[in-house]
Amino acid sequence: MKIIWERIDNWLAANAPQVLKSLRPGANDEELHRAEVFFGVEFPEDFKLSYRVHNGQDEESYSLFPNLEFLSIQSAIEISEKWQNCSDDNFRCDGDDIFEGIWNGWWKPNWIPFTNESNGACECVDLAPAAGGNVGQVIIVEWQEPTRGLIAPNFRVYLETFADALERGEYRFSEDGYGLVDLVDFEILMQKHN
């Protein structure tokens, strides 16, 4: 995980130093243990190793992941509490919104959010998948819609895929886009200024 973060940090240093500056120092063992106690699970080793490098990013900073704040461990706890407090036992996804391997409900206490969008969507490490899913898979959970989707089979693949995309030039920094944006969004933002 350190090597993956070195790749990301190097790209940020050259292309988006504002984002690099917003990344927090790594979490310590006590912070990680406290979060594991809160969530009632042991985090996957890659997830812990990643958070030992960077414990999220400063709030109100340019986004690392497009349109998503990279959450600190403490913020992950707070987001999870918010979702749990708004729990709807009758909520169910239907039709195209059902994905095999992802629990069909509002919120699972063993979903560990690590990103958050201003509209409430978040990406989570799923430590309680439904039948056909993989423990540690990365999912998207939408606040305003009954949408749950699979993003990556695990956190390492998620982060490595992001590093690969950065190095291929698939993202740009945009002050108007509040941080890193993909090339399609970047072109739309640039058209607004022309």
Give a label for each model feature.
Residues 53, 115-117, 128, 141-143, ...:
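Structured loops at beta-to-helix junctions and adjacent beta-edge loops in soluble globular domains
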Residues 72-75, 126, 154:
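Helix N-cap / beta->alpha transition motif
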Residues 159-194:
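Long, compositionally biased interface segments
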Residues 140-166:
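A recognition module on extended beta-rich or small alphabeta surfaces enriched in W/G with H and D/E
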Residues 101, 105-108, 132, 149-152:
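Short, amphipathic alpha-helical segments
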Residues 123-143:
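Low-complexity, glycine/alanine/valine/leucine- and proline-rich hydrophobic stretches
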Residues 1-118, 173, 188-194:
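A surface-exposed partner-binding patch
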Residues 57, 120, 131, 144, ...:
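Short loop/turn segments at secondary-structure transitions that flank enzyme active sites
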